[in-house]
């Protein structure tokens, strides 16, 4: 047993220890320094990447010895390219990395490489040093001749982007295994130091570069290539010397390059080529000479290059004298010839005869005006012929003879006015034909011979109609481009045989009409451009195109638009710059559409609703319209929204639910809305917008909120402010009269809770009626105050009138008044208790009047007054009790009056923040001045103390003296300096009596001054207590009476108790036996509010009510009046959702109105009215006005809306609270008996559908059946499958994207990578040149625009 256990332990140790050791060794082996990380795939393809600031600079020293040498095979060092500090490599820097095979140094600003910089790297195979020293124009990389002496096995050396000026002698000679050398993008002028010349090498007994296979010297400063300069490179296959400044090549510059296959001399300054240049390079396969100035070609210069496949002579100055039959003799294997952008004006008839293998011929951008007959007859393998941008005017019958394998023919940007009918007879394989930008007046009949044609471009011609049948027979045509012609009418049948057509571009024509059904046979169409025409209607054009995903009809004259005009699979739609006034949705199919990008900008839209916008939309442009109203919940249930643009419209206000979104998941970005550049009014309905970006995830992110400016409905200063800078009490609405819902005396003249604006005044309120501003400024009131000043006024402006005097208790009852302006009103007298009852008054402005005295009781009761302005009056006397009870006074202005003496130190509050006393004729009595100065010294809030002066009367003259001089500042007037007897500067004959009053002592007391007078008691304390208690009791009784409804609602919502509720009176005998708790009557346009807000809260809340919704639960086809009567009889309450939509739609229908009136005339107590949004009173029906007066009236958005609604509804039983909403609908409706009526469009359109809230519905007593038919709609899952199938069919390959770009974006041949199709407001643009979204539409450019 013990032996068995021992063996088991040994076995476990044998298995576990190697595994643990391997894991541990791998962890230890692949440890990287702090600045480095390992990257790559397998164990044998791993690279150590180090991100350094610099190497051995003044900032830091770099120690590469910390890198593990045994596992580091590949090392990449990247310095910070933002730091301009020089790096350096010290000798033996990499000596420890003996296994290193690949070393890359990038962005390290090395100035030199010393002899021992790379000592020890004997196994290195690849070395890349790119310092990017070109970032420093004065810094270059200098190398020692022995810098690379260690690299005996180096195969690849990259020294590009180092700003190298000079190569050390024989630098690469020690590199016996070097195969690839890249020294591009430097400043090298002379390559003789490379010792690549056999003659120089033999002279110095050194042979260098014999193993090189590729040499890249492009983008340097070489000006010439002498004879045999590269003759030692016998194995060289690729030579790149492009982008230099070479203007001279020696006759035998390529001597010794026997293995050369590819030579690139593009972008130099060559004007000619030596005749013997290619004498020893007979293996050449590719020659690139484009972008030079070659104007001479020696005859037969290419004659011995039998292996040549590619010859690129584009962008030179060759003319017809040097491009002739002798030029291409011997090039029997040439496959691509590029002669574009030269000066060729004519071609010999047999010029291309030696080129039997030619496949691609480019002759664009020359001066060719005619093509000899049969010129291409020997090019039987040619598949691409580019003749764009020449001067060809006619294509004759034999011009294209022999091109039986031609696939692409580009003749665009010529002067072609005629093509022979048989000119394309021999081009039967042609697939892409470009004839745009010519002078064709009709579609060429020659097209009848190219039945395999896939793309045809005849844009930018003068074609006015499609008459011949040549184009109608192109059954394989994939894309047709006819933009910028003169087409005026498209008749039905023109495109019928083009069954493969997927892209159609008819933009920028003069089309006024397209016959309905013209495209019904082209079911494969995916993209259509009709922008820039004169179409007035698109009805019947696109409904039969199930695969259409892209449609541009902008810049036309459309006045009507309906979603029934487009297929449900359309994903991108542009209708901007038309005359559309409404986004119609007659069949209510917004939930079935697939639109993701929709541009309806620059139209005449005035209103948008939820049905105006498809539910699938992601990007929506509605800018530059005339939109003045956005219906509530317009953007609700649009889950894919990412951006909405509403700038430059006519919006003046937005209610909170106008931008309401469905709740957004936390992992999704909130949609971005742009709503700026509208004439907003900062009224009471817009205060919510200021903080919308701080709301929950049911409101969008307003990206331009800080740029929104609005006009204040009421402003006593600037009327335009930035929205985010507006104060909360700036958001006001104007009103003439208003009566609160709980006010019961509105029909009587004397009604305190009725807000009625006085004559000649303007009145404003905020959303919650917290602010109530009454402005009667300069209203020409004489002697008396305006009548009926609202009791709830918070700001009252009466300035600029003529009142003379204000009676006692003039403002009694205005207990909420905070600001009162009475300035500039010629007031002479304030009676006692003038402002009594203004318990909340904070600001009182009485300046610039004619007050002469304050007798003590004028401001009694203003316990909360904070600011009192009395300047610029004629006040001479002030009673000592005037200000003593103003405990919260902060600002008091008494300047510019007639006060001579007032003991401010005894009778002013000590908690002031600002006091002004200047410009009064203060007495210079030393007793007064000493106390006044002491008061000023102790209180900093006397802000005008330096301006205070007193008057000294001496004889017939009055002298002013400074009371409180500034420190260190000379006074312009003498300063009062009191001694024990006289003020300083006055003689002993000065009469103090004269100082007080006049010329003699008898007048000395003429100015009234009451000092230290004992306070008067106006009321007996007991009487005050009794009166206070009585007032308190009366206020409590009044509050209970006024707010009795709120109290009942609160008690019901909190405790379930109904106060003052007579069960015998309020409950019908059979009420509890009724099937439903409430029948909800509403407009179909408000269905979203009912289904998403009202019904879920009532049916699924704590008290689960059973509701009957007519849009959901009524049998389709039933007789509506009788059905409504039965629904109301079966319900304990009737909820009527009154909105502008309800008034303009359902209530105006005779049957609906009659049914409601007949049932509700005697049952008004059972009716609950919910007002949704603003309902214009003038448009209300008289019956509705009566309903609103006599029934429970709830405003959506009220803070206690749900509590009041539940209070108005009957109580539900406890058993019902636990039931699931809707389970009382026992009898399911027989859907087979449904009947549905529509005036169907001439094309069959899918009927709208909605997802039912309940799976079961109740059955009302059967109404009279109407004949008709009902078509059950597909489920949501089926719709998603259909949309996915449509999207799947629209997937295109890269080749199709190339064709789309050419057909939709511009004319010309297709070359290079396909531009990506990017849907923007202006159409699909090239990704490299995107247009700004929603720019003013302009005619499409020929190349960049679609």
Curated annotation (Swiss-Prot):
A Pfam family annotated for this UniProt entry: TIR_2
Sites carrying sugar chains: 63, 112, 126, 182, 291, 426, 468, 505, 552, 640, 823, 832, 956, 1000
Disulfides per UniProt: 682-710, 684-733, 757-763, 761-776, 924-950
One Gene Ontology biological process: regulation of protein glycosylation
Signal peptide: 1-21
Extracellular side: 22-1021
Disruption phenotype: Viable. The legs of some adults have the correct number of segments but are bent between the tibia and tarsus, causing the leg to twist in the wrong direction. Formation of ectopic bristles on the heminota. Slight decrease in the branch length of NMJ3 and a reduced number of boutons at NMJ3 and NMJ4. In larvae, tracheal cell morphology is normal and basal expression levels of the AMP gene Drs are unaffected.
Organism superkingdom: Eukaryota
Inducing stimuli: By Gram-negative bacteria, in the respiratory epithelium. Up-regulated during vesicular stomatitis virus (VSV) infection.
UniProt keyword terms in alphabetical order: Cell membrane, Disulfide bond, Glycoprotein, Immunity, Innate immunity, Leucine-rich repeat, Membrane, NAD, Neurogenesis, Receptor, Repeat, Signal, Transmembrane, Transmembrane helix
Domain TIR span(s) in chain numbering: 1074-1209
LRR repeat boundaries on the chain: 97-120, 124-146, 151-174, 176-198, 209-232, 234-256, 257-280, 282-304, 306-330, 331-354, 355-378, 380-402, 404-426, 427-450, 452-473, 474-497, 498-521, 523-544, 546-568, 570-591, 593-614, 615-637, 638-661, 790-813, 814-837, 838-861, 863-885, 887-909, 912-938
Gene3D superfamilies cross-referenced by the UniProt entry: Ribonuclease Inhibitor, Toll/interleukin-1 receptor homology (TIR) domain
Primary role: Toll-related receptor. Probably specific to larval innate immunity. Involved in the tracheal immune response of larvae to Gram-negative and perhaps Gram-positive bacteria; upon infection it negatively regulates the immune deficiency (Imd) signaling cascade specifically in the respiratory epithelium to prevent the overexpression of antimicrobial peptides (AMP). Involved in the NF-kappa-B-dependent apoptosis of unfit cells during cell competition. Involved in neuron-specific glycosylation.
The protein's assembly and partners: May interact (via the extracellular domain) with 18w (via the extracellular domain).
Protein name: Toll-like receptor Tollo
Species of origin: Drosophila melanogaster (Fruit fly)
Organism phylogeny: Eukaryota, Metazoa, Ecdysozoa, Arthropoda, Hexapoda
